[in-house]
Amino acid sequence: MIVEGPVLKYGDKIDTDIIIPARHLKYTDPAYLAQHAMEPLDPEFYKKASKGVVIVAGKVFGMGSSREQAAIALKAAGVKAVIAESFARIFYRNCINNGLPLITLPNATKEINEGDVVKINVETGEITVNGRVLKGKGITGMALDILKSGGIMEYLKKVSA
């Protein structure tokens, strides 16, 4: 599974309240959530992401309260994948279950810059950027099967058919 796109870069400790503020949690429409993704940190995020982007971030991306809407908002906004130095565990699983690939890469914010175009091999974790190949942690097994299906619901439909 290959994912490619230009980079939007953010720092450490981007929590779910930044990814999708609590005032929007009463809504379930992915298109609505997308318009408010990352709004407190980057009011232009939706416009930038709508072209299809890869987020690069620092440590503990997705920390804070567990909200599936965070993964839904990012994916619906046009985020193709997230590369970070580390992820909050429940956020990581929410993203996999919603079909959004996450790659852990030590020193991601030092290795990749805003505007770079990255090509990610989700299975191996290899990230090609500016002629260099970086080695992140790939996704394998059932998590990869879920991603390839487009999310947990699609995966369950496929395996129960």
Curated annotation (Swiss-Prot):
Keyword set, alphabetical order: Amino-acid biosynthesis, Branched-chain amino acid biosynthesis, Leucine biosynthesis, Lyase
CDD domains (UniProt xref): IPMI_Swivel
Gene3D superfamilies per UniProt: Aconitase, domain 4 (3.20.19.10)
Pathway: Amino-acid biosynthesis; L-leucine biosynthesis; L-leucine from 3-methyl-2-oxobutanoate: step 2/4
Catalytic activity: (2R,3S)-3-isopropylmalate = (2S)-2-isopropylmalate
Enzyme Commission (EC) number: 4.2.1.33
InterPro entries: Aconitase/3IPM_dehydase_swvl (IPR015928), AconitaseA/IPMdHydase_ssu_swvl (IPR000573), IPMI_Swivel (IPR033940), LeuD (IPR050075), LeuD_type2/HacB/DmdB (IPR011827)
Lineage: superkingdom: Archaea
Gene Ontology biological-process entries: L-leucine biosynthetic process
The keyword Cell inner membrane appears for this protein: no
GO molecular function, one term: 3-isopropylmalate dehydratase activity
Family recorded in the similarity comment: Belongs to the LeuD family. LeuD type 2 subfamily.
Function noted in UniProt: Catalyzes the isomerization between 2-isopropylmalate and 3-isopropylmalate, via the formation of 2-isopropylmaleate.
Complex formation: Heterodimer of LeuC and LeuD.
PANTHER family reported for this sequence: 3-ISOPROPYLMALATE DEHYDRATASE SMALL SUBUNIT 1, 3-ISOPROPYLMALATE DEHYDRATASE SMALL SUBUNIT 2-RELATED-RELATED
Protein name: 3-isopropylmalate dehydratase small subunit
Source organism of this protein record: Metallosphaera sedula (strain ATCC 51363 / DSM 5348 / JCM 9185 / NBRC 15509 / TH2)
